[in-house]
């Protein structure tokens, strides 16, 4: 039986997708990345990586069959790498494949000068947690709940607060967007360059009142993920966040009909959980974040 650890290649996508699907179906095997359930989701996310996935992802192959997957996503401007996997086929567990894959993923992050690796494990994935902790990862923050929503199940908020309008942002909104981001997410790690790119792509939606930005949300078209729904402090508890999210979703689906979007939120953030459920978001899994300084 010949085992080979090698770089991910386009021909591995079907096998990796099957590993992702299997893990998602088993709470005791769930990880934060990948969350691919369709070939389209996999293609969309990997096609947008600035550093090609072939340079940062790996597979383990035995006798020509892909039995394991891991790696990192490294984006210029970010000081961290996002961990993918490790995922190992059930028939090949107990052979230290996950350990080898994780060590190789860490090495690839180091080679790209990442200062830390951020990963996540399903709250019931005891084996994955032990694997990360043995490699030096430590829990970070509280548990997060992951939700998904497709267009057909979206319950739109029909009426928003008076004088509030929602529109796609432009690069001219960078200063106001960064101000909101720093206020709402003081520990956030998204660099200004990422926000500028999102504004240029029309992926950032702005809620305005009396000519001032009062709320924002970022919908990443490649990841199909909703990031950073934020409302300035003196405008909270007025339904602004719910309306901005709803209008942003409607705007997104007008250009990307039928796509499914995801988001994550702290599992004990009851107001946010209620907001998302009211708009039709369905719970998918609960994750615990982990971090490894490099």
Language-model features and meaning:
Residues 4-18, 164-177:
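A short beta-loop-alpha structural element at the N-terminal edge
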Residues 120-122, 138-152, 264, 282-294:
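Conserved catalytic-core motifs of GNAT/GCN5-like acyltransferases
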Residues 95, 99, 123-141, 242-243, ...:
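Conserved active-site alpha-helix within GNAT-family acetyltransferase domains
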Residues 109-123, 252-264:
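Conserved GNAT acetyl-CoA-binding A-motif
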Residues 90-93, 119-129, 233, 262-273, ...:
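Conserved beta-strand-loop-alpha-helix junction that forms the acyl-donor binding cleft
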Residues 44-59, 68, 82, 196-206, ...:
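A short helix-loop-beta-strand connector motif used in the catalytic cores of GNAT acetyltransferases and
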Residues 88, 94-107, 134, 231, ...:
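Conserved acetyl-CoA-binding loop-helix of GNAT-fold acetyltransferases
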Residues 24-46, 178-201:
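Conserved GNAT-fold acetyl-CoA-binding loop/helix
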């Amino acid at each position: 039986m010949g085992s080979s650890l090698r770089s991910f290649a386009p021909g591995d996508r079907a096998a990796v997708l099957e590993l992702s699907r299997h893990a998602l179906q088993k709470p005791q095997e769930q990880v934060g990345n990948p969350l691919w359930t369709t070939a389209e989701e996999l293609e969309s996310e990997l096609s947008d990586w600035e550093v090609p996935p072939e340079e940062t992802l790996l597979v383990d192959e035995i006798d020509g069959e892909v039995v394991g997957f891991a790696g990192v996503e490294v984006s210029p401007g970010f000081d961290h790498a996002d961990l993918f996997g490790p995922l190992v086929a059930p028939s090949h567990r107990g052979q230290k494949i996950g350990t080898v894959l994780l060590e190789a993923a860490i090495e690839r992050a180091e080679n790209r000068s990442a200062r830390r690796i951020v990963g996540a494990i399903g709250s019931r994935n005891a084996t994955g947690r032990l694997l990360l902790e043995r490699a030096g990862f430590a829990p970070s923050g509280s548990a997060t709940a992951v939700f998904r929503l497709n267009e057909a199940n979206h319950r739109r908020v029909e009426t928003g607060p008076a004088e509030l309008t929602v529109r796609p942002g432009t690069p001219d909104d960078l200063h106001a967007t960064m101000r909101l981001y720093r206020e709402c997410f003081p520990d956030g790690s998204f660099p200004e360059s990422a926000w500028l790119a999102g504004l240029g792509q029309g992926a950032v939606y702005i809620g305005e009142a009396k000519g001032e930005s009062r709320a924002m949300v970022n919908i990443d078209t490649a990841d199909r993920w909703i990031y950073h729904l934020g409302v300035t402090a003196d405008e909270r508890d007025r339904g602004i966040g719910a309306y901005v999210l709803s209008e942003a979703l409607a705007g997104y689906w007008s250009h990307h009909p039928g796509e499914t979007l995801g988001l994550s939120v702290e599992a004990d953030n009851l107001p946010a959980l209620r907001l998302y459920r009211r708009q039709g978001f369905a719970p998918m899994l609960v994750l615990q974040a982990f971090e490894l300084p490099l």
